[in-house]
């Protein structure tokens, strides 16, 4: 029986564009499930990559009520499906899925930072975004910055003290 890997993004475009061909390749070694907000791209992913998809609405902007509902849906999904690994990209999907995976004790919880929002924010918003990224890292077992610039910011802003691993040569 193959280990179950969930790949998660806030919007399906991220899975469809950034991971083009990767899900299909990974499905040779894992039972891959793509999780993202509903949309036509989910059907494209299912057909092109040959993986199962699950739609869970997630807002890109901060929305406490909708974010809480998305978190609960992810918790229910993980409790039911019992994935071996959860690997997220995009900030909101990272926060929600790492928290849900931590709560449901998924053994491998990986987040790839494909960019950071907080360096361009100011004041209370920057502090909130930093806190969110720190929580994402706290809940993750593995953290992958997409390149040296993102890695440098994660270190300089003290987001995490966990090891940071750039995949291959970086830059998604």
Regions found by a protein language model. Name each.
Residues 77-84:
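Glycine-rich phosphate-binding loop signature in dinucleotide/nucleotide-binding domains
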Residues 28-66, 161-168:
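Conserved nucleotide-sugar phosphate-binding/catalytic loop shared by glycosyltransferases and other
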Residues 3-9, 101-116, 144:
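Active-site proximal beta-strand in glycosyltransferases
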């Amino acid at each position: 029986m193959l280990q179950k890997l969930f790949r998660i993004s806030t919007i399906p475009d991220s899975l469809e564009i950034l991971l083009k061909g990767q899900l299909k390749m990974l499905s040779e070694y894992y039972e891959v499930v793509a999780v993202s907000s509903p949309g036509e791209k989910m059907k494209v992913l299912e057909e092109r990559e040959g993986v199962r998809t699950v739609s869970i609405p997630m807002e890109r902007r901060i929305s406490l009520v909708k974010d809480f509902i998305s978190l609960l849906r992810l918790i229910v999904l993980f409790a039911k499906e019992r994935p071996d690994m959860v690997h997220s990209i995009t900030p909101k999907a990272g926060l929600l899925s790492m928290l849900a995976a931590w709560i449901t004790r998924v053994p491998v919880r990986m987040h790839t930072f494909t960019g950071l929002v907080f360096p361009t924010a100011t004041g209370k918003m920057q502090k909130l975004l930093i806190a969110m990224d720190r929580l994402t890292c706290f809940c993750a077992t593995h953290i992958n910055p997409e390149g040296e610039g993102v890695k440098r910011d994660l270190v300089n802003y003290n987001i995490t003290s966990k090891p940071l691993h750039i995949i291959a040569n970086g830059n998604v």
